[in-house]
UniProtKB/Swiss-Prot annotation:
GO cellular component: cytosol
Top-rank lineage group of the source organism: Bacteria
Residues given in the record as Mg(2+) 1 binding sites: 90, 109, 111
Family annotation (InterPro entries): FBPase_C_dom (IPR044015), FBPase_class-1 (IPR000146), FBPase_N (IPR033391), FBPtase (IPR028343), Fructose_bisphosphatase_AS (IPR020548)
Catalytic activity: beta-D-fructose 1,6-bisphosphate + H2O = beta-D-fructose 6-phosphate + phosphate
Source organism (scientific name): Rhodopseudomonas palustris (strain TIE-1)
Protein name, as recorded: Fructose-1,6-bisphosphatase class 1
């Protein structure tokens, strides 16, 4: 593909059979909706858009913001002419049924991170597209069955990250022309970046393997990793994943021992599945710490899942700490700067 090529050109070349035509239509519709959402976010309070509570809660119990509701309305409107069997949204208690014989179903979070709106931080839209099998309940297959996934980042630029199952491409919104243009093709997660993203304030609640990994990073050059690490935490899933795609490192949102946090807080169908598909397509890895996220199946629309994703070596290290606790280097004197061993 050529630098600056529009998203619509890519989708036109991709749409070679009925299923792919439906996928292309869905991606194009979500992209169009995201442009409208981007404009609303950019206007902020000038357009009456704030992070104020709407007065209700979504299906997952989160307090809905004004923009959550507007973003949901925009995405549903954008998808009205797309041939889908069902829609699953963070903002809905139940599936929105379409044509049961349509070739695809779509899961999405219309506005991820809406609590960041009033602080002018990054938010986004996440989506997952799966094949529909007539007679089979939608969204019951493993995440590995996804045929397309992506997310939009509403930041200094509005960017669309997309995989159609053959690598990851990044597009940026040309605001004058109101089209997405290709800026990076076949993105690969950098393999060796000394960065990790986690909410360290929850350290006391984590399982020991997560504590062990983070403690190794904190130990830096004096510890078993033999290098200093930087910690990042934005509190926005789309921003964290975009950074890892472009800079490398690892993102952790594990389960912990707080009530209601045993499986973390991220939702499988419209957060961890699509982000994991994107990450693997970019040469990274995504795990719960014990198993591959894309091997998981959802029992409910809003099922949660831990998420550890990023550079393969770091994800594998965290998995090893879960399966073999003896791999933890807690006897620091042997591994410190002046110790006998380094790993």
């Amino acid at each position: 593909m050529d630098q600056g090529q529009t998203l619509s050109v890519l989708l036109d070349s991709y749409a070679v059979d009925p299923q792919k035509k439906a996928v292309a239509a869905a991606v194009g519709a979500i992209a169009a909706g995201s442009i409208e959402i981007s404009e609303l976010i950019g206007q902020g309070a000038l357009a009456g858009i704030t992070g104020a509570a709407h007065g209700g809660s979504n299906a997952d119990g989160d307090v809905q913001k004004d923009l959550d509701v507007k973003a949901e309305q925009i995405i549903v409107k954008s998808l009205k002419d797309v041939p889908y069997a069902a829609l699953a949204s963070e903002e809905s208690d139940t599936l929105l049924d379409g044509d049961p014989n349509a070739p695809i179903s779509i899961a999405y979070d219309p506005l991820d991170g809406s609590s960041n709106i009033d602080t002018n931080m990054t938010v986004g839209t996440i989506f997952s597209i799966i094949p529909n099998q007539p007679g089979v309940k939608p969204f019951t297959a493993a995440g590995s069955c996804q045929i397309a996934a992506g997310f939009v980042v509403y930041g200094p630029q509005t960017s669309l990250v997309l995989t159609l199952g053959d690598g990851v491409n990044i597009f940026t919104l040309d605001r004058k022309a109101k089209v997405y243009r290709l800026i990076r093709e076949r993105v690969k997660v950098p393999a060796d970046t000394a960065e990790y993203a986690v909410n360290a304030s929850n350290h006391r609640h984590w399982e020991q393997p997560i504590r062990d990994f983070v403690d190794e990073c904190i130990a830096g050059a004096d510890g078993p990793r033999a290098k200093d690490f930087n910690m990042r935490w934005i509190g926005s899933l789309v921003a964290e994943v975009y950074r890892i795609l472009t800079r490398g490192g690892v993102f952790l949102y594990p389960g912990d021992n707080r009530p209601g946090y045993g499986n973390g807080r991220l939702r499988l169908l419209y957060e961890t599945h699509p982000m994991s598909f994107v990450m693997e397509q970019a040469g990274g890895a995504a795990s719960t710490g014990r198993e591959r996220v894309l091997d998981l199946t959802a029992k409910t629309i809003h099922q949660r899942s831990p998420l550890i994703m990023g550079s393969i070596d770091k994800v594998k290290r965290i998995e090893l700490l879960h399966t073999d606790p003896s791999a933890a280097s807690r006897s620091a004197p042997l591994f410190a700067r002046r110790g006998l061993f380094r790993v």
